[in-house]
């Protein structure tokens, strides 16, 4: 034990650690006193001593024990007292990292499970499927065996075929044991003590048995492996193959060759002179206080530092770091809290004497292990780095070139099992030597069969080639056989002319009907007659060579047949431009149908069109075409039965070089735009399908460009850019009869992530479910006929309803017209007849004027003036209607009325005007001015009877006007009258009094009238009392 964890060879590592702690001022304010007890790796003794330390000495922490059984007893007891235990040395049992049992344990030792995981990872990395574990009677090697058996039993890749324990470590016994293993394995994992020359003896035994050839690999592993170095009695670091005893055996070179067949798993140590100086200082400081080990430590066995002295150093330093962290974060009162000390160690990392120390949060060191070997010059180098956490290993090759790793093996990785087996007797039989006659017979048969197969293959290939040529003739469209369709009809026939001549012919024998519709020809599309049938042509601006695989694709396209896929006719390659030809569909494309807006597309109509597109796309995706790649509304054609047929598919050799049009880019998926894919994808087709659907449900072009502020290139840029909220067409303005599930499907189909879009099979399934409950029309044609029948029946009702509305509106317009013109005149104008001026022999004309109107106007606002006149004349108009009179016009406050025209009424006109004048005078008695209640309205009235001429003047706002001296005389009667009086001319007086005796009149006498001279005039005072 002295060579591993002996007190005489390791205790001073504590003082060396304390010197470092003090120099770094980690715990300046805390004094640490050490109590040394010796358990001698005895489990009972260790339990008793630790009990006294915990109960009597009230220690803050226990460092040790260094053996597994004793250590487990102590950590079990310390857990009860919540006192931290820091283990080191030989305590490699994996039980120490079980925090459920031992929550106060901190171990700096790489446990056996970690070493076993590293060994297992080596086997996996180099593809060794089985190996043998060789170990001596040593506690740590036993733990390795147990954990290695557990890990390999759970592994699906490598297995532990055998474990061999060596009890006698003599050279003779090593030879005997290895000779047994020679026929068992070629990959060996070896666990031997680090001290002494046991490793050298083991490898020399293998060398002597010829077990150090390129077939053998020996993997040494241990928590404290010194790799390929050892410290001699003089303190020098020499190779592990060197015999530095007093009587060397002289086999150092043979031992070196043997060690070139080994690999070692080692912790990352402090390299070189620093580590050697530490080990030397450990021995020297044991002679100094507080140890004063002078006489005892002179013994030869105590002249080299213990194997695990560096771990004791790192344990003390780690404890100081944890204390420092605990005090800074929680205070000094927590430094004896065992479970808390464990968690405080999380994240601590430092360069110790045992290598890089990294701690996790459960008191367990995460070992950094290296895999090392010797190169062809016997120089140690690191092959790989391993970061280990319990059973998981993060492997990184330090040397990438496998040949360089195995340069000592001539650059070849040793195999798990040799080609000839472990015994060397299982080499493959040389079949050609042992069975030559069978080989000859079989060879002859094979030659004959090959000749027959070659002849048959030739015939099959020739027949297939002839068939391919025949099928090629079907898709090749000679340019000379095309006829161009000329727009317009002549005598109910379409005319066309050959592309190769100037002669004009009539295509009365072709398949073009008198009702065929051909849409405008563009740079990419045209219409022709081929084989007496109209065809649709797609033009290509580039010419590309057509290879064998392209011809195969064209033959395949000719075989495509589906109700919703437009038939491919062929390809013309001998004209000015390449043109592909497709079956002509009389109703054009979906884009054309939407643009014409002549079809009433309801929800079911749109559903049927979309279902046809989805069905055709599903066929394409499951056909050898795989994807469409450039689906737009322009390549979805509709035949005369309103069936959608998808065209412009396939021709991948043209798609790869043809530049997409602007309309095509508006239908292209964002990932296709970003990645520049020319052939497209199935997910991209589903996106294009959704854009076409948005056109149908929105009754608009793609993205509704006509009503958007963005240009097409801006939309393409925003779609290509993507983002958290992708830019997509609006589905807000759709008809109410569109199924909401259809809108959800469209949004799913244009999802930014292609993986989130439904495939076309799912789309068709969802489309079918949308119509599962519909009764009535089963297809679009039935639906169209049903709609036409309903439309015809409702059209009759609508016509009758419109006629009623028209009659009502006519009545309203007639009433308005009759108020503007006399009815007789208006009727003639409505009939389009001219209204000639007409002379009337006897009429009576009435003029009136508001007295003092200017004064009233000055007292009123313009709006009040208008309201005053409107109220006054509304009162007058009601009186006029009762007296067979016609109001000619009102000019300001002047009022002109006539009776006796345009309907002649004999001599009643004078009585009508007289009665009307009297009623007007009476109505003024009760008339009030709303804004001038104290004011009274008075008028002057003038009347005159005589002849006049009437006629319509003007075209815009025509007026029925009176002409003649009678009009002027009536006006003079009004202007020369008095307020509140009715002024009559002598002619009017004579006519009135001669015919009607009931009126009360009075002579005014002679009055000078302007333009007339002296005239005898009269006042109309009212009705006689007996008449009233």
From Swiss-Prot:
Q: Which GO terms describe its cellular component?
A: plasma membrane
Domain of life of the source: Eukaryota
| Tissue-by-tissue expression | Expressed bilaterally in RIM interneurons.
- Give yes or no: UniProt keyword Nucleotide-binding: yes
GO BP term, example: receptor guanylyl cyclase signaling pathway
Stretches assigned to the Guanylate cyclase domain: 844-974
List the stretches on the Cytoplasmic face of the membrane. Answer: 459-1028
Q: Where in the cell is it found?
A: Cell membrane
Among its keywords, does the record have Transmembrane helix?
Answer: yes
The Enzyme Commission number assigned here is: 4.6.1.2
The way it spans or sits in the membrane comes to: Single-pass type I membrane protein
- Pfam families hit by this protein: ANF_receptor, Guanylate_cyc, HNOBA, PK_Tyr_Ser-Thr
All copies of the Protein kinase domain together span: 499-770
Question: What's written under domain?
Answer: The protein kinase domain is predicted to be catalytically inactive.
This protein is called Receptor-type guanylate cyclase gcy-13
């Amino acid at each position: 034990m002295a060579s591993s964890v002996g007190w005489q060879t390791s205790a001073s590592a504590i003082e060396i650690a304390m010197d470092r702690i003090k120099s770094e001022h980690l715990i300046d304010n805390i004094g640490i006193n050490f109590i040394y007890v010796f358990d001698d790796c005895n489990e009972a003794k260790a339990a008793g001593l630790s009990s006294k330390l915990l109960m009597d000495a009230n220690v803050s922490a226990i460092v040790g024990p260094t053996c597994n059984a004793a250590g487990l007893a102590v950590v079990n007891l310390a857990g009860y007292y919540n006192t931290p235990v820091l283990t080191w040395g030989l305590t490699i049992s994996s039980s120490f990292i079980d925090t459920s049992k031992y929550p106060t344990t901190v171990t700096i030792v790489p446990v056996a499970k970690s070493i076993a995981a590293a060994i297992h990872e080596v086997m996996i990395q180099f593809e060794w499927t089985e190996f043998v574990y060789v170990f001596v009677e040593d506690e740590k090697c036993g733990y390795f065996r147990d954990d290695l058996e557990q890990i390999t039993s759970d592994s699906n890749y490598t297995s532990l075929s055998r474990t061999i324990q060596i009890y006698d470590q003599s050279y003779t016994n090593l030879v005997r044991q290895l000779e047994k293993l020679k026929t068992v394995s070629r990959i060996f994992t070896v666990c031997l003590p680090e001290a002494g020359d046991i490793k050298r003896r083991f490898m020399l035994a293998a060398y002597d048995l010829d077990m150090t050839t390129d077939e053998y690999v020996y993997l040494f592993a241990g928590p404290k492996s010194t790799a390929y170095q050892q410290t001699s009695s003089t303190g020098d670091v020499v190779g592990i193959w060197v015999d530095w005893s007093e009587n060397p055996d002289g086999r150092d070179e043979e031992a070196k060759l043997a060690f070139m067949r080994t690999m070692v798993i080692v912790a990352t140590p402090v390299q070189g002179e620093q580590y050697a100086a530490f080990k030397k200082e450990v021995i020297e400081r044991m002679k100094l206080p507080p140890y004063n080990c002078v006489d005892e430590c002179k013994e030869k066995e105590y002249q080299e530092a213990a194997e695990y002295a560096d771990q004791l150093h790192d344990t003390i330093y780690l404890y100081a770091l944890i204390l420092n962290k605990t005090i800074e974060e929680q205070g000094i009162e927590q430094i004896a809290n065992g479970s808390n000390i464990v968690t405080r160690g999380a994240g601590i990392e430092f360069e110790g004497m045992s290598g890089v120390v990294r701690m996790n949060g459960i008191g367990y060191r995460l070992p950094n292990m290296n895999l090392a070997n010797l190169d062809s010059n016997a120089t140690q180098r690191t092959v790989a780095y391993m970061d280990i956490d319990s059973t998981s290993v993060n492997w990184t090759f330090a040397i990438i070139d496998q040949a360089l790793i195995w340069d000592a093996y001539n650059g070849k990785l040793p195999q798990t099992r040799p080609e000839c087996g472990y015994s060397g007797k299982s080499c493959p039989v040389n079949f050609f030597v042992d069975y030559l006659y069978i080989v000859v017979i079989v060879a002859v048969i094979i030659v004959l069969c090959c000749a027959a197969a070659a002849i048959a293959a030739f015939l099959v290939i020739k027949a297939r080639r002839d068939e391919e040529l025949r099928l090629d003739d079907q898709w090749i469209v000679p340019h000379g056989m095309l006829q161009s369709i000329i727009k317009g009809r002549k005598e109910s026939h379409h005319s066309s002319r050959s592309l190769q001549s100037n002669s004009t012919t009539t295509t009365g024998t072709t398949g073009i009907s008198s009702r065929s519709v051909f849409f405008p020809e563009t740079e990419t599309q045209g219409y022709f007659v081929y084989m007496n049938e109209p065809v649709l042509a797609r033009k290509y601006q580039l010419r590309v060579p057509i290879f064998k695989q392209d011809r195969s694709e064209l033959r395949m396209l000719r075989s495509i047949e589906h109700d919703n896929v437009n038939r491919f006719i062929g390809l013309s390659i001998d004209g000015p431009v390449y043109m592909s030809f497709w079956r002509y569909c009389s109703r054009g494309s979906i884009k054309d149908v939407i643009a014409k807006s002549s079809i009433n597309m309801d929800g079911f109509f749109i559903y049927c069109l979309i279902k046809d597109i989805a069905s055709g796309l599903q066929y394409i995706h499951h056909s050898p075409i795989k994807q469409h790649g450039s689906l737009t509304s322009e390549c979805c054609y509709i035949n005369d039965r309103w069936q959608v047929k998808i065209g412009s598919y396939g021709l991948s050799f043209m798609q790869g070089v043809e530049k997409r049009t602007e309309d095509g880019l508006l239908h292209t998926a964002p990932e296709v735009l970003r990645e520049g894919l020319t052939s497209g994808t199935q997910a991209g087709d589903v996106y294009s399908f959704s854009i076409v659907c948005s056109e149908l449900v929105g009754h608009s072009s793609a993205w509704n460009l006509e009503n958007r502020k963005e240009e097409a290139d801006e939309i393409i840029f925003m779609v290509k850019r993507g983002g958290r909220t992708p830019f997509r067409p609006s589905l807000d303005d759709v008809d109410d009869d569109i199924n909401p599930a259809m809108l959800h499907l469209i949004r799913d189909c244009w999802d930014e992530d292609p993986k989130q879009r439904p495939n076309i099979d799912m789309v068709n399934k969802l489309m079918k479910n949308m119509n599962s409950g519909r009764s009535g029309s089963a297809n679009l044609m039935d639906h169209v006929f049903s709609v036409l029948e309903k439309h015809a029946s409702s059209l009759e009702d609508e016509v009758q309803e419109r006629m009623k509305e028209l009659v009502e509106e006519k009545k309203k317009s007639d009433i308005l017209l009759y108020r503007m013109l006399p009815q007789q005149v208006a009727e003639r104008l409505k009939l389009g007849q001219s209204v000639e001026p007409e002379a009337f022999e006897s009429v009576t004309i009435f003029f009136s004027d508001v007295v003092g109107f200017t004064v009233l106007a000055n007292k009123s606002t313009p709006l009040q003036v208008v309201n005053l006149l409107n109220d006054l004349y509304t009162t007058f108009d009601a009186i006029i209607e009762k007296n067979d009179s016609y109001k000619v016009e009102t000019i300001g406050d002047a009022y002109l009325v006539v009776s006796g025209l345009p309907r002649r009424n004999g001599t009643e006109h004078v009585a009508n005007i007289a009665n009307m004048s009297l009623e007007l005078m009476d109505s003024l008695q009760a008339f009030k001015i709303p804004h001038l209640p104290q004011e009274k309205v008075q008028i002057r009235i003038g009347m005159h009877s005589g002849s006049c001429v009437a006629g319509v003047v003007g075209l815009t706002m025509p007026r029925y006007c009176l002409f003649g001296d009678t009009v002027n005389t009536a006006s003079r009667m009004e202007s020369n009258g008095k307020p509140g009086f009715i002024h009559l001319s002598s002619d009017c007086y004579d006519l009135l009094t001669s015919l009607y005796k009931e009126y009360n009149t009075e002579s005014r006498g002679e009055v000078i009238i302007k333009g007339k001279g002296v005239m005898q005039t009269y006042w109309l005072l009212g009705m006689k009392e007996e008449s009233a």
